[in-house]
Amino acid sequence: IVAAGSLLGLAINRGNFSFPVGKVDMLTMYPLSFEEFLLSTNNETLIEKIRESFETFTPLADVYHNLALDLYKKYLVIGGYPAVVKTYLETENYDSVRAVQADISDSYIADMTKYATPNETIRSIAIFNTLPSQLAKENTKFQYAVIKSNARAKDYELSLQWLKAVGVVLENIKVTEGKLPLTVYEQLDSFKIYYSDVGLLCFKSGTFPQDVLVNSSISDRARG
């Protein structure tokens, strides 16, 4: 039997039934990485050239360098959700891409209302919708005050944990030293929160695809 679901872990925690320990193999799925995006767009040769350049510490030839930059900009807009990538490959239309991303965003919010308590839902949606503002700050550290002026960590911690548990967002914790194991040096009260998909960030921030695809210096003007 093969089963798939983004909320399987939460269903197990909330359900009143026994779990067959040792009889279920779990595999966590993530959006496509940039390398997987290149594979999906039939750019295997470019992958090999990038890998070869990295391993030999030699510059990438201009023709491959420019191609890689163009495809990376597309990846920033499209992201790695399979349905979004599939839509782009079939249509090459960014309005269609945005429509699928909107559906995914709405589906996440619908899941929050279905599986979380009413208070958790309100706070989870608030966190979810304000991430672009968090990442656009000069200091991109996650701050509860961005959600609401008088917001406190204790009021939103549970909702943030919920979003992380279902894979909607990813947490990046600051470390005081770059030594192994990194967990020993984690500064737990200083962290950043990202959407699990870069294309979703582009969509939720309201960034127009052409601003990323055409402007060569988008990183000089954009934040997040």
Regions found by a protein language model. Give the residues of each.
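Interdomain motor-coupling "hinge/lid" segment immediately C-terminal to the ATP-binding subdomain
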Residues: 5-6, 11-136
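Accessory nucleic acid-recognition modules appended to NTPase machines
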Residues: 86-224
